[in-house]
Curated annotation (Swiss-Prot):
This is L-arabinose isomerase. Its EC number is 5.3.1.4. Keywords: Arabinose catabolism, Carbohydrate metabolism, Isomerase, Manganese, Metal-binding. It comes from Pectobacterium atrosepticum (strain SCRI 1043 / ATCC BAA-672) (Erwinia carotovora subsp. atroseptica). The gene is araA. The keyword Thylakoid does not apply.
Length: 501
């Protein structure tokens, strides 16, 4: 939630001089009460800031330009208290580059049947003023969201809050820097993609670094800093005998701490908030970064394995979106299946890199064990399971002419049986609507084998994100029917081809 404290959403009231000073004074007074009420009672993640009433095209244009250049402003929330002729908004909306939410509300909840007169009617014109504003948005093909409801309604609060989270994530996306240590895993297709196209679409940049650049920083870490981090490990986790003092793999734990400190310093020095590694590019490192990656994800960094920069960026963006919510968000991979009639399950995991924010255990196990991939020393890692609850897996892929997001809703379950020989963190879930349908749909749509797994975010967040980023979205949930899903793939292909002309 700390990420949101410095951010603002500007609350903008549109009107016109036609109504006279007394009506405009009352509009301003009502707006102040609405903003104060929302800030105090709606549990919104981002503060609303009331801006001066805009009544002319020049005022609207100036405000939109100002919003573009204020880094702490993540978007505009507009309310048409009275009628605001929408031609006045064309100039401002033409230049606006921040997310826009139209709050279709009114000051009073109910009609004052006994006292309502024409003065009241002229003051409270959201019902048609909002439609005028909506027309110009549609006419300009302006991507904006609409929330309808009274400003004291809890459902409206929830929807505004979700929009704020997505707006903050989009702001993060525009300034995000992703570091790739090494390259993509050789011969893997889905982790490739158009980095220039991604920067144009999402705003984030992706830069490659040789392992020598990283190892130079890792090698410079002092023994004192390593010892201090080891003390933190011993307080936070259940260490196995192998990594305790004088244990057979104690040095592996010391090496992991050194890698963590070096990676974090490298990322901080470069202003990176997401990164990738690749087990085929480990020259100069003593082990594949496992514990380091897990702990950096827990601190909010995005990560993708095998050079998967799209998933690394998406994880960081979703972590920002989920700030302060219960439940965690992690890098994930569908690893293996349990095909059992009536109990089909997916075991999600990775070689090492699963984020502890999704851990069920308060103190995960910390161990160093053999890893047959990478050809390095036994890597340290945290081992835990994941609590039951509603979850989702999200993936962004490059289709060549567009970016496609897939979201599969899943139901995470308690681990049904012990896994005494599995030395990695994991989550176990039932895919919606079934493993058979979900896997077939995912494969038909080209979904990646890497995903972002979240128990903090829901489909509303992801749908909003796709809409506000203007990317394709395919949802796999309990409503999915394969013949309809295949039709959607065909229709989308035509739609996006036409849109690209």
């Amino acid at each position: 939630m700390d990420h949101f404290k410095q951010l603002e959403v500007w609350f903008v009231i549109g009107s016109q001089h036609l109504y006279g000073p007394e009506t405009l004074r009352q509009v301003k007074e009502n707006a102040e009460k609405v903003v104060a009420g929302l800030n105090q009672q709606a549990n919104l993640p981002v503060k609303l800031v009331l801006k001066p009433l805009v009544k002319t095209p020049d005022e609207i244009l100036a405000l939109c330009r100002d919003a573009n250049y204020q880094d702490n402003c993540i978007g505009l929330l507009t309310w048409l208290h009275t009628f605001s002729p929408a031609k006045m908004w064309i100039g401002g909306l033409s230049v606006l580059s921040k997310p826009l939410l139209q709050f279709h509300t009114q000051f009073n909840a109910e009609v004052p049947w006994d006292t309502m007169d024409m003065d009241f009617m002229n003051l409270n014109q959201t019902a048609h003023g909002g439609r005028e504003f909506g027309f110009i948005g549609a006419r300009m093909r302006q991507a904006h969201q609409v929330v309808v409801g009274h400003w004291q309604d809890k459902n409206a609060h929830v929807r505004i809050g979700k929009w704020m989270r997505v707006a903050a994530a989009i702001q993060e996306s525009k300034q995000l820097k992703v570091a790739r240590f090494g390259d993509n895993m050789r011969e893997v297709a889905v982790t490739e993609g158009d980095k220039v196209g991604a920067q144009i679409q999402f705003g984030y940049s992706v830069s490659a670094w040789g392992l020598g650049d990283l190892t130079a920083v890792v090698d410079a870490v002092s023994k004192g800093d390593i010892d201090a981090l080891i003390e933190e490990y011993e307080t936070s986790y259940q260490l196995t005998d192998a990594v305790k003092l004088n244990g057979a793999n104690r040095q592996n734990l010391l090496d992991a701490a050194q890698i963590e400190l070096g990676m974090k310093r490298f990322l901080e020095q470069g202003g990176y908030h997401a990164f990738t590694t690749d087990f085929e590019n480990l020259y100069g490192l003593k082990q594949l970064p496992g514990l380091a990656v897990q702990r950096l994800m827990q601190q909010g960094y995005g990560f993708g394995g095998e050079g998967d920069w799209k998933t690394a960026a998406l994880l960081r963006i979703m972590k920002v979106m989920a700030g302060g919510l219960s439940g965690g968000t992690s890098f994930m991979e569908d690893y293996t299946y349990n095909f059992q009639n009536g109990n089909d399950l997916v075991v999600g995991s990775h070689m090492l890199e699963v984020c502890p924010t999704i851990a069920k255990e308060q103190k995960p196990i910390l161990d160093a064990q053999h890893l047959g991939i990478g050809g390095k020393a036994d890597p340290a890692r945290l081992i835990f399971s994941t609590p039951a609850g509603p979850s989702l897996n999200a993936s962004v892929i490059d289709m060549g002419d567009r970016f496609r997001m897939l979201v599969n809703l899943v139901d995470t379950i308690e681990q049904p049986r012990p896994l005494p020989k599995l030395p990695v963190a994991r989550a176990i879930w039932k895919a919606q609507p079934s493993l058979e349908v979900a896997a077939e749909a995912w494969i038909l749509a080209g979904g990646a084998h890497h995903t972002v797994f979240s128990q903090a975010l829901d489909l509303d967040h992801m749908r909003l994100y796709a809409e506000m980023q203007n990317i394709e979205l395919l949802v796999i949930d309990n409503e999915t029917r394969l013949h309809e899903f295949k039709d959607a793939l065909r229709w989308n292909e035509v739609y996006y081809k036409l849109c690209s002309r």
